[in-house]
Amino acid sequence: MFPLLGQSACAALNSLPAKRKKAGLQAHRKVYKQLLQYHSFTKINKFLELKHPDPKKVKYRLFFEVSLGPRIVDVIVLTSYETERVCYVVELKTCLGSEFNFTSVRAAQRTQGLCQLYDSTKYLSNNAPLGGERWEVRAHLLFKSQSAMKTLYVEHPGFQFNQLQCTTGALSVFLKSREDVACRQLLYQGLQCAALAKKMRVLGTKSTKRARDKPTQVSRVPAQRSPVQKARGRKQAESHKKGASKGRAG
C-alpha cells in the first residue's frame, strides 16, 4: 500500500498562506482553459508531457475535477486508436517561479500527489463499469509554473491498478457523471466568451479597413430653382431661338 501523507508534509502544505492557495487554484483553472483551446491531441500531449507514442492518430476526450472516491482528479484524458486505449489520470501541482527547487513544500506536494494518484487509480479500476474493451490506466504527476505554465517536473508512478475492462461509452459516462459541473460550465462559458470576443475583434478590423479604403461618395441632389430663375431660363431660351432664326435667314 502506498504510504500516507506524513505529518511533516501536511504541516508544510498547511503552512501556506491563503493567498498562495488561491493563486494555485487560479493556476489550475488557467491550465484547464489552455487545454480546451487546443484542437489536437498532439498539442495536449506535448503540453501535459504525456509521452503518448503516436499522438497524431488518436481520438481523445477531456474531463476536469473528477471525483473518484475520496479524491478529486484534476484532469483525466481518454485516448483511443484502434485497439489501443489509454486513460491518463493527471494530478497537477503548480509552483511559483520557473525553476523546480526540491524544497520541503515541493516534496510535500509530490508526496500528496502520489497519494492522490494511488487512491484515484485504485478507485477507478475497481468501480468502472465492466465492458468488453481493455484500457490501460496511467498515473501522471505534473508540476507547472503558475505564470507561464511551463512544465517543471513530471513523474509516471507505476501502480498495480493500471488496467480496467470497460467500453468507451460507459467509461465516458462514468467520468462525466463524477465531473464538477460548475467547474466545467465556468470553463466553457469563458471559452465561448473568448471566442466571441475574438470574432468581434476580427470583424471590427475588417469593417474599419473597408471603411478606410473605400473612397467617400457624396450624393448629388438636383438643386431646386425658384420661379424667377425659371422665368429667366425661359427668356434666355427664347432669345437663343430668335438669334438662331435670324442667322438662318441671313
UniProtKB/Swiss-Prot annotation:
<dbReference type="Pfam" id="PF01646">
    <property type="entry name" value="Herpes_UL24"/>
</dbReference>
<comment type="similarity">
    <text>Belongs to the herpesviridae UL24 family.</text>
</comment>
<dbReference type="InterPro" id="IPR002580">
    <property type="entry name" value="Herpes_UL24"/>
</dbReference>
<feature type="region of interest" description="Disordered">
    <location>
        <begin position="205"/>
        <end position="250"/>
    </location>
</feature>
<protein>
    <recommendedName>
        <fullName>Protein UL24 homolog</fullName>
    </recommendedName>
</protein>
